[in-house]
Structure formats: structure tokens, C-alpha cells
Amino acid sequence: MEPLARFEEIKIPLIEPVHGLEAVSGVLGVPEWWPTGARVSVVLAHGASGSKDDPLLVALQQALTERKVLTLRFNFPFAEAEKSKPDPMPVLERTLRHAIATLGRDPTAAPAHLFIGGRGLGGRVAANLATSQVRSDGLFFLGFPLHPPGRPAELRVDRLFRIVSPMLFVQGTRDRSCEIPVLRKTLVRVGAPTTLHVIDEADQSFRVPRKTGRSAADVHREILTVLDAWIERVLGG
């Protein structure tokens, strides 16, 4: 049986070297028969303590690519250089912009639709970029860092009010960086269409207690189902 997708290790050039690096690593997921069909693409950015090999991002890429979506997950420079401290926001934004640009290198195979987002910090970088430099069909946040851990009064929401694309928030009830009641109040004030999906008992990394009887794979499947259905709705499917 022929595979439904292929996955290619790629290098994403950086205009300016960071940590002595001239490029960062990425994995491009190419669906069977691409670029036929709706030509939808999804770019997945990792969080502050992760990398492109975050198990959730790997699982999402595998499943979405098999569902005929062009996908890309990649390293920010600090992860590529195995540094623990994230790069300054301008560096992160440039890297995400370069990653997105790789999808359109071949105009004959460029996607017609773009969705960007990711885990924690990666989602925040996507939000920053979407307000000024990149046009996307939608943004998704897998654990949005709404405020510093345990300090809900110190909100980081200015960028959300400038976004016009639809947004999906997937949040765990035990995420100390995003209290659900505070997020709900914030989203009421956001002008763009928003969708919130809450995962009971999940923390910022979407881990759930053993008592729930749910495995990491169960949670990953739930997130995939929500993300896939949301993309379909945004595209009018």
C-alpha cells in the first residue's frame, strides 16, 4: 500500500545568523497527490521548553498530513542550538516568517490556505506575526500563555485585539499560565471570531492525572479532532 504522506527533513535559512547558526531544522509533511485539492497548510511552532520534536506536534503533523494538509514543524534557533533560554521575540518572529516562506518556494505547489500556531510560546509568536507581517486563514493556540504562572492580573493580550483572523484556543483546566475564567472574559472583548476548547484536568503540557484514565495519546487525538474540525469550519466545509 502506498503511503498517504511523506516527511522530509529540511533546513530553513536564517537571514542573520543566530547562535552561530545560518539555518534551523524543520520537517515538511507532504500529503499524497499534493498540490491537488484544497491546498491547506499548517505551520506548527514549539513552546519555550520544547523543540520541533515535541510529541504533540509530531502527532498532529502525522495525522494532518495524512488528511491532505501540507504541514511544517521546525526549531526556533534557541532549540536548534540546545539553549534553554528562548530567543528575543524579534528573532522568533523572523524565524517563523522564514518557516512560512519555505512553503511557497515553488509557486506551482504553494498552499492556498495557511493556518499558523503551536504550543505556548510558539502560539504567542504566531499571534505577534499575524497582526502585522503574515496573513493567515486562522491561528490556533495550544496552551496560550495568557499571563505569568499564577499571576492572572498580569495579562499578555494586546496582540489578540489586533488579530482579524479566526482563532482557536485549546486550554487545560490546570494550566497555571491561562486561567479559564480570565480567558473567557478576554475572548468576549476580542473582535475576531474565537473558539475555546477546554480539556478537563490538563496542565500546560496537556498532561492529565492518572486518575482520569486517559493517556497522552488520548489527549493528542482530542486536540487533533478539535483542530481538524475547526479548520474545516473556517474554510466553510
Model-inferred region functions:
Residues 135-147:
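A conserved short beta-strand
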